[in-house]
Amino acid sequence: MINVEIVRNYNKWREHKQINKSLIKKITQNILLRFDNFSKIKQFELSILLTNAAEILTLNKQFRNIEKATNVLSFPSNELNWQDLYSKLEFLGDSDYMHLGDIAFCYEVIYNESCEQHKTFENHFIHLLIHSILHLIGFDHQNDTEANIMENLEIEILSYFGIFPPY
């Protein structure tokens, strides 16, 4: 079971009714089912903040020391590494609950990027959601090898949902 908490701090998000708990749960479940190590955990929780440029700028400055609005920020609850998920999950014990983390999305940046890249707002959001969840479970793109692995997984998941790959 996946519990999703959504906080909408910016009214423009309400125009996108298809961005809801059901969509976020479906995508999260699709990602987690790709990793056998998550099968022991019965309940996952994910917190989503749908906000604006001013708030994301504050968060980006506070947590990354970058004074710029960004499309999305991911805050993992656990220090997971996709290459060693089994031992990391064993370390967490026999808990049947895991809070994956928090994700903050910025409406204005996502809107501008989707226009510039000729994508629908929703498809761009889905791509960023997939990208962020992968960060929460230990994926990164600090070097070319990691970036290729993460991008290929994103492409595979996007294709499953009928979305053309952005790369």
Curated annotation (Swiss-Prot):
It is found in: Cytoplasm. Its EC number is 3.1.-.-. This is Endoribonuclease YbeY. Binds 1 zinc ion. It comes from Rickettsia peacockii (strain Rustic). Coiled coil: none annotated. NCBIfam families: rRNA maturation RNase YbeY. Zn(2+) binds at H131, H135, H141. One of its GO terms (cellular component) is cytoplasm. Single strand-specific metallo-endoribonuclease involved in late-stage 70S ribosome quality control and in maturation of the 3' terminus of the 16S rRNA. GO terms for molecular function: metalloendopeptidase activity; RNA endonuclease activity; zinc ion binding. Gene3D superfamilies: Metalloproteases ('zincins'), catalytic domain (3.40.390.30). Keywords: Cytoplasm, Endonuclease, Hydrolase, Metal-binding, Nuclease, Ribosome biogenesis, rRNA processing, Zinc. Belongs to the endoribonuclease YbeY family. Its main location: cytoplasm. It is an enzyme of class 3 (hydrolase). Its cofactor is Zn(2+). GO terms for biological process: rRNA processing.
